[in-house]
Amino acid sequence: MELPLAFNDQLFIQLTVNGVTLGSLYALIALGYTMVYGILKLLNFAHGDVYMVGAFIGYGVLSGLGGPLSPDLALAPLVLLMFLAAMLGSGLLGVVIERFAYRPLREAPRLAPLISALGVSFFLQNSVLLLFGAQFRTYNSFVLGSSNPEVFEPGPLIDPVFKIRGVNVQLIQLIVLLVTVGLCVALTLLVARTRVGKAMRATAYDREGAMMMGIDTDRVISFTFFIGSVLAGAAGVMFGLLFSQVFHFMGFLAGLKGFTAAVVGGIGSIPGAMLGGLLVGLTEAYASGYFGGRWAEVVVFGILIFVLLVRPQGLLGTPELKKV
């Protein structure tokens, strides 16, 4: 007997592909949350807006180099330039945010950095709103020949689709997965094998002890913000390439889902952030496919509440020991 469409194996595999793609973006965002929390015990709620700024930097590169200014530029080097500009710009933005919004408040009551983070978030959203307007901006309108940013060209910028046993896999989905895996491997090697990685781990374990050992903890913290923001910038560009549109408010919900991924996986744990991102992406895809898009956020944030109640340290996190 043939199962109804909602329970079809083919649909399940398609949703899994979509969920892994989404989860890759959430994992990159979650890594920024978890790295900063691991070192400062600070929740950087402006992180989602750094992701949004990265997406708009990619849009700026595309509109300048992919449109009338250089119409013959090949797509591959153009996409590479978008990634490099967005990652560098987002990384520098993260350093500036740490220096001026968080560093002066390190010894302040814990509520002060949270309020500062919300202020930075609103500042970034409204700055992008003033620069680009409230309408959706589309990545592929320039490449496809339209110079009007209000023209919506549906579909991803990188279009080819492979059909594998009836399941559609877009080339951009493969690119997102490969880039995410590459960045996660690079981050893991950075933290585990390099001097700066050892300094990051020492600072996370005991900041005062690290200072006594001669580690410049201010520089380490700035570098941590830089790396987390670089990953968010890459995720922002991949969102634009995947969904073809960016908007000034896109960082809010993506930031919340990235935070959810970090908490579910175990905030402060790098492998936990990666696992949490995949779980949140898969949950969102399955909920949308089987119950309708309006249920996606309900299920995702319901899981966040459940994890906080049952295992507050997350799946791969460790309980914090209080010193007496």
Regions found by a protein language model. Give the residues of each.
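Membrane-interfacial amphipathic/re-entrant helices at transmembrane-helix boundaries
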Residues: M1-I29, I57, P68-M82, A108-A112, ...
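Cytosolic-side transmembrane-helix boundaries in multi-pass membrane proteins
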Residues: E2, Q10-L11, L131, Y205-M212, ...
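Inter-helical junctions in multi-pass inner-membrane proteins, predominant
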Residues: F7-L25, V169, L190-R195, I221-A261, ...
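Single transmembrane alpha-helix segments in multi-pass membrane proteins
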Residues: F12-S63, V96-A112, V264-I270
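Helix-loop-helix "hairpin" substructures at the membrane interface of multi-pass membrane proteins
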Residues: L22, R165-V246, I270-L275
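Short loop segments and helix-boundary regions at transmembrane helix junctions
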Residues: G38-A46, L92-T138, L190-G197, A202, ...
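Alpha-helical transmembrane segments within multi-pass membrane transporters and channels
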Residues: L69-V120, S127, L275-V280, E284, ...
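Transmembrane helix-bundle core of multi-pass membrane transporters
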Residues: P104-L105, P113-R193, V220, Y286, ...
